[in-house]
């Protein structure tokens, strides 16, 4: 079985929680795109963990985890993240973590450039996490990056690094007027944070190809959501990578494989980190109440998330882009404080009702939500474990979303713990 776990919205839908829950059915979990610019929060019997780079399967003792070729890796962050998990009792070794030799290294100057550009943009900034993601992907396509396979021979990299640094300083010093990047500092950084992972690096294409031939099941874990995809998201307020399920085999290094299923993760309401149009956004006390009820603060940045009612227009589009065969609806329990639950069923654009998600940023900025309101269920549902345990109003809300999105809802999350998930069929 080859399954992708993907976000249908702006990210932060609860993918890590669902990967942790479902990964017991899989032998291997693969991260295939992005970097440490988003976080997956997992609560299990070992504690609460926030994962930025590592696949969520790392929390299961018998699961092999892979960082695929499409990933960009900040070595310092990976060093600290693995150390933090080990302190929490999680075992990490080359036996359960394999890193593609083709994965790109996110260097310190990528983070520097990310911050310098956000500062230059001022009020026009994109809301970057300043983790260097866009600069490193840009350099990847300029063919001026290092890859994880290069860590096998750090001592022979100096000449190559010097050439890249000379080129980067044309921008860092020449363009932004910042102090130039120092080659010695970069080499020391690679030595300190890169060498510890040299034994983890391998040809993951060979590993995954052989594993699938041997009948192993693989889960592909995405980062962010469909609306952050570089091509089909809310451009330019997107990530720099392809966040779609269709990219999972490619970013994992096994483009010859075909997915069996794509499980789309969406919240029972909307949330968003960063800038850009967010049609269903709530403000003031209304937003504060939902943000506090849902604990809506970024796992990677700690930034308060923008929140709003469920957006059926955006979610339907996201599910289509992800080719979803089923939906996991998360944080249904958060809605229990509402008397009436708002659902955006369409947009009003220049006086006309539309039900398709606009691809043009200017149109999306002008769009206004058209709401319908459903009865709230006004009770604690966190102890529910079967569909029949849910109050009728909660089930009605789930069925309404299922019809609006056009995809069956297979899982419903009603609490943060592993057992707090209801399987609908």
Regions found by a protein language model. Give the residues of each.
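Non-transmembrane, aqueous-exposed alpha-helical and coiled segments at domain scale
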Residues: 1-425
């Amino acid at each position: 079985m080859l399954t992708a776990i993907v976000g249908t919205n702006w990210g932060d839908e609860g993918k890590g929680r669902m990967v942790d829950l479902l990964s017991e059915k899989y032998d291997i979990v693969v991260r295939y795109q992005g970097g440490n610019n988003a976080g997956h929060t997992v609560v299990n019997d070992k504690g609460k963990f926030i994962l930025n780079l590592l696949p969520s399967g790392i929390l299961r003792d018998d699961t092999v985890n892979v960082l695929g070729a499409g990933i960009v890796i900040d070595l310092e962050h990976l060093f600290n993240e693995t150390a933090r998990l080990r302190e929490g009792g999680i075992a990490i070794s080359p036996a359960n973590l394999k890193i593609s030799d083709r994965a790109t290294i996110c260097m310190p100057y990528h983070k520097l450039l990310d911050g310098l550009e956000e500062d230059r943009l001022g009020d026009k900034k994109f809301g970057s996490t300043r983790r260097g993601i866009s600069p490193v992907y840009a350099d990847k396509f300029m063919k001026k990056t290092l890859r994880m396979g290069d860590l096998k021979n750090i001592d022979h990299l100096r000449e190559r690094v010097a050439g890249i640094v000379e080129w980067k300083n044309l921008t860092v010093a020449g363009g932004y007027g910042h102090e130039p990047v120092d080659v010695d500092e970069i080499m020391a950084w690679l030595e300190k944070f890169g060498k510890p992972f040299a034994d983890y690096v391998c040809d993951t294409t060979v590993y995954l190809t052989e594993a699938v031939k041997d009948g192993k099941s693989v889960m592909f874990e995405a980062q962010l959501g469909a609306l952050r995809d570089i091509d089909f998201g809310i451009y330019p307020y997107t990530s720099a990578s392809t966040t779609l399920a269709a990219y999972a085999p490619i970013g994992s290094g096994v483009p010859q494989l075909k997915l069996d299923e794509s499980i789309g993760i969406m919240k029972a309401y909307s949330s968003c980190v960063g800038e850009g149009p967010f049609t269903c956004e709530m403000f003031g006390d209304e937003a504060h109440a939902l943000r506090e009820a849902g604990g809506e603060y970024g796992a990677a940045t700690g930034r308060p998330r923008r929140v709003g009612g469920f957006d059926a227009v955006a979610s339907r589009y996201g599910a289509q882009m992800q080719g979803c065969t089923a939906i996991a609806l998360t944080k249904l329990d958060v809605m229990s404080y509402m008397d009436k639950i708002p659902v955006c069923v369409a947009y009003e654009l220049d006086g006309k009702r539309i039900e398709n998600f606009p691809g043009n940023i200017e149109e999306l900025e002008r769009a206004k939500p058209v709401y319908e309101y459903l009865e709230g269920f006004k009770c604690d549902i966190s102890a529910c474990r079967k569909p029949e345990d849910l109050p009728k109003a909660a089930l009605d809300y789930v069925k309404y979303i299922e019809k609006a999105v056009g995809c069956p809802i297979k899982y419903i999350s009603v609490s943060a713990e592993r057992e707090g998930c209801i399987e609908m069929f």
